[in-house]
Structure formats: structure tokens, C-alpha cells
């Protein structure tokens, strides 16, 4: 018997076709699945740390003090703290027109 059926009297059907008794019926439970809304969780990114170290490599001879050293550690100029040797160091890497 469906939940929506009319209440039927237990006695013979009266001529007025009325229902004199209260009709209370409990229907089956309804099940509703409520999905949770999407949740955005932000996880912190990794922490990258480095420990840079400055290292000076050169000659321990007194002639190299105050001089600009080449990649091999040989003094380029002996002019003390001047920058006269700086141009010759970088000019060797330039492409010159022929």
C-alpha cells in the first residue's frame, strides 16, 4: 500500500463516502545524500635555503697583492690598485671584426 493511498474505513463504506477516522500513516524514510562543497586547501610550498660562500682564490705571493688575477692566478697588471689591466682582461673575450 502506497503512502499516498486514501484512508479507507474499516467498516462498510458509508453512502456519504466519508472517512470518519483519522488517517495517520508513516511513510518510509527518505534518504538524501548531501555532498560537501569543494574545499580548497593551500599547502605552503617548500622552503629552499642556501648558504652561499664567497671564496677568493689567488696567489699568496706579494706580487699578486692589489693586482687583477687571470683565471690561472697570474697577475694581469702590476699597477697596484689601478684598473688599467681591467680592459685587457675583458677585451680578450670580445669578437673583433676582421
UniProtKB/Swiss-Prot annotation:
Organism superkingdom: Eukaryota
One Gene Ontology MF term: structural constituent of cytoskeleton
N-acetylserine found at: 2
The keyword Acetylation is assigned to this record: yes
Cellular component, GO, one term: intermediate filament
Keywords: Acetylation, Keratin
Subunit structure: The avian keratins (F-ker, S-ker, C-ker and B-ker) are a complex mixture of very similar polypeptides.
Family: Belongs to the avian keratin family.
PANTHER family documented for this protein: BETA-KERATIN-RELATED PROTEIN-RELATED (PTHR31203:SF1)
Name under which the protein is recorded: Feather keratin 4
Organism phylogeny: Eukaryota, Metazoa, Chordata, Craniata, Vertebrata
Amino acid at each position: 500500500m502506497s503512502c499516498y493511498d486514501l484512508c479507507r474505513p474499516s467498516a462498510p463504506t458509508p453512502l456519504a463516502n466519508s472517512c470518519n477516522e483519522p488517517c495517520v500513516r508513516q511513510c518510509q524514510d527518505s534518504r538524501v545524500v548531501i555532498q560537501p562543497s569543494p574545499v580548497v586547501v593551500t599547502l605552503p610550498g617548500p622552503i629552499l635555503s642556501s648558504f652561499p660562500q664567497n671564496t677568493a682564490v689567488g696567489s699568496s705571493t706579494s706580487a699578486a697583492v692589489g693586482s687583477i688575477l687571470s683565471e690561472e692566478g697570474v697577475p694581469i697588471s702590476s699597477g697596484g690598485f689601478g684598473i688599467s689591466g681591467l680592459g685587457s682582461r675583458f677585451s680578450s673575450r670580445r669578437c673583433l671584426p676582421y
